[in-house]
Regions:
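A short, hydrophobic/aromatic-rich structural module that often spans a beta strand
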Residues: 117-130, 150-168, 332, 401-416
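Short amphipathic alpha-helical segments
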Residues: 66-72, 155, 187-189
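Short secondary-structure boundary/hinge segments and terminal tails
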Residues: 113, 151, 202, 369, ...
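C-terminal catalytic domain of photolyase/cryptochrome flavoproteins
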Residues: 13, 33, 40-41, 363-416
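Acyl-donor binding region in acyl/amide transferases
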Residues: 65-149, 311-312, 317-384
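A conserved beta-strand-loop-helix scaffold within acyl/acetyltransferase catalytic domains
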Residues: 3-47, 51-64, 138-150, 160-334
Length: 416
């Protein structure tokens, strides 16, 4: 076996045959290599065949040294201890030659599969791997819960689409989620793809989510850059409604109800004691009153907000392996139109139609209590029948141990 720098073609051919995270991609390499020159492709070859690969990026640390990050890599057969130890031992040598101070490694390796309430369905024994990496100097950072600004989320909510059609996926959802999706179609909620020049439309809705949940994530430039990095594998999607069309739809249904009510009133004149007719008339009158109210509300909305309402928007990345629901926002004033449900269904069907086997709702905190900061988000994802995947977490390898300690002291001083 030989530890080598890979060509772009060698890297691409290998990841195309393996399950990988979207950050381990040719798109990511192209952008970083062209714009920042801060990306490396390394791997292992045996008899000229690539058997391991990893995209690494670098950043400045302590002025003269570098910090490296593995972006959910490396991609290799972790059940092969000889290959695993060979890669990680030789990675240290490579990093030292690149003036690395330390590296953060976060393999895309499952620790547990759980149900939506956190109960373990399947456990993966990673103790041998952790011990092997520990002996090589890679320190496991523990099993984190919650969100972090310094590492990738360890808990993901995922919907399995493999060998399933739209009908099956809908049947497996919670009743209310299924009903909400159906209602978005009944109301005429539509979805369109936004151009990168329309990022501000997405970002305005995203900022509403930041305000609602009291967090600050990224600026508009970040989302524009992500669209450039994953230009052929990302989408900004907008759910919106044409209120004039919606009003006409309501008026048509209301007119039909009025005809039915008139017909029932005529029948009651002929048979005033018909309990069945009276019950039906009461029900239809209630429905008709509801439609009248909705028509008036819609007319008011048109007069104050205009004809088109932007309901919700989401940023997606997709690969051959997964569709990733990464960032989103919605206007809380228009929750009754349930734009977020329409967006999810649009991209779930996109995944099914393109034979992509996983719909990744992405991060949750891993705190399954009712007091968790993302309890509502978890319940939303649970409604789609998503399960939870808990990953192994981060490893840090100090390459220059003394200087790394100085780096940590300096970092902690700034935090205080």
């Amino acid at each position: 076996m030989n530890f080598v720098e890979l060509t772009e073609k060698e890297f691409t051919d290998f990841i195309n045959q393996n399950f990988v995270h979207y950050t381990q991609s040719t798109s990511h390499f192209h952008y970083r290599n062209n714009k920042k020159k801060d990306v490396h492709l390394v791997g292992v070859k045996e008899d000229k065949k690539v058997i391991a690969a990893c995209l690494l990026t670098e950043a400045r640390a302590l002025r003269f040294f570098k910090y490296f990050y593995s972006h959910r890599g490396p991609v290799l057969d972790y059940s092969n201890p000889i290959l695993t130890e060979f890669f990680f031992e030789n990675l240290k040598v490579y990093l030292k030659a690149q003036k690395a101070l330390f590296a953060l490694i976060d393999p895309y390796i499952l620790e547990n599969i759980r149900d939506a309430d956190g109960k373990i369905i399947e456990h993966y024994d990673n103790e041998k791997l952790k011990n092997a990496l520990s002996k090589l100097g890679y320190a496991h950072q523990g099993y984190s819960i919650g969100y972090s600004t310094t590492s990738q989320i360890r808990w993901l909510s995922v919907l399995n689409l493999k060998n399933k059609n739209e009908s099956t996926i809908l049947k497996e959802m919670d009743y209310q989620t299924r009903r909400n999706i159906k209602k978005t179609f009944e109301m005429g909620v539509e979805v369109k793809t936004l151009d990168i020049s329309e990022t501000n439309v997405f970002f305005e809705l995203f900022q509403m989510a930041e305000e609602k949940h009291n967090f600050k994530f990224r600026d508009k430039a970040y989302f524009e850059e992500m669209q450039k990095i994953y230009a052929n594998h990302s989408m900004l999607k907008l759910a919106y409604i044409n209120l004039e069309n919606y009003k006409q739809q309501l008026q048509k249904k209301n007119a039909n109800l009025l005809l039915e009510i008139k017909d029932l009133e005529n029948k009651l004149q002929e048979n005033t004691n018909s309990k069945k007719t009276k019950t039906k008339l009461y029900q239809l009158t209630q429905q008709q009153n509801s439609y009248e109210r909705k028509i008036n509300e819609t007319i008011e909305l048109i007069s104050t907000e205009g004809n088109i309402l932007n309901l919700a928007a989401t940023f997606y990345i997709y690969t051959k392996d997964e569709v990733y629901y990464l960032s989103s926002g919605s206007n809380p004033k228009y929750n009754q139109f349930m734009g977020s449900y329409r967006l999810q269904w649009d991209m779930i069907t996109f995944a099914i139609n393109n034979a992509i086997p996983r719909y990744n709702f992405y991060g949750i905190t891993g705190d399954f209590s009712e007091t968790s900061e993302d309890y509502g988000v978890q319940q939303f994802k649970k409604g789609f029948n998503a399960h939870v995947e808990e990953y192994i977490g981060d490893f840090i390898i100090p390459i220059r141990k003394y200087l790394y300690k100085l780096y940590l002291l300096n970092k902690n001083r700034h935090v205080k």
